[in-house]
Amino acid sequence: MSDLVLVLNCGSSSIKFALFDAGVQPPPRKPLWNGKVDGITGPAPTFGETGVTPGPVALDTAHPYNAALQYIRTRVLARMEQGGHHITAVAHRVVHGGAKYSDPVRVDAAVLADLRSYIPLAPLHQPFALEAIAALLESNPDLPQVACFDTAFHHTLPDVEKMLPLSWDAWERGLRRYGFHGLSYEFMSVALPERYGDAARGRTIVAHLGSGASLCAMQGLESVATTMGFSALDGLMMGTRCGSLDPGAVLYLMEIEKLSLEEVGQLLYHQSGLLGLSGVSSDPRALLPLEAENAQVEAALALYV
């Protein structure tokens, strides 16, 4: 029987999971088994796993996220029984740990309540990871769960890089630049020296490029500057997010065009970036073949790069 660690990465429309052997040192980078449920909130969700082509999966349309979690749980438990394995702990990617959490932390009810207070700072991601944690706390209260934070890697930022040019009172109230994608950058801080030796310990710029995107400047393998700030809206233009934007434009949308707070949030998070400008897709792979024949697509890609 092997002791395994289950790793969950819960997003707004997908849940990725992986199983790692807990008894191997150093910890393995390649999972024994992994997969994901994708398109959870869409009309045609799919499930895929190691060695299996993704196929359709039926989820309760009233509670699709809980249904997806339960589906993964059932598949993982079945896999465990087949191999005689045992899950000893669950690790979660949690986007926001605020100024408080600079290291992974074991989650209990008090920590969970604390992490819920950061939902307004990461509304696209935080609720879904916490939903999974809460579900497992209820069904398996004795199973250790550990939260690993995307913000933690950026705790090494100098104060001047954390500050927003607002009032000192705002700084003391916690309005500051946190930085994101830290788990990705932390991985690179380990992988780069293995490939490039001491050169990687100098001044390095690392890019995290996906639907969400950011850059991180590292020195001595620590974060010293990053493009994302107070929220995951900041920095580079992204798939559906605007990136850096003159705040006067937001005031104009609300004061002159009379958009509500909810409408502005929907625009900035879900209807901007590549999707907003192209009117076609948030995925560069879908846009590149259309660049020569569609002026909007051409403009979107030009601004993106």
Predicted features along the sequence, with ranges:
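Short beta-strand-loop/turn "lid" adjacent to the catalytic site in phosphate-handling enzymes
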Residues: V76-H125, P144-V146, F153-M163
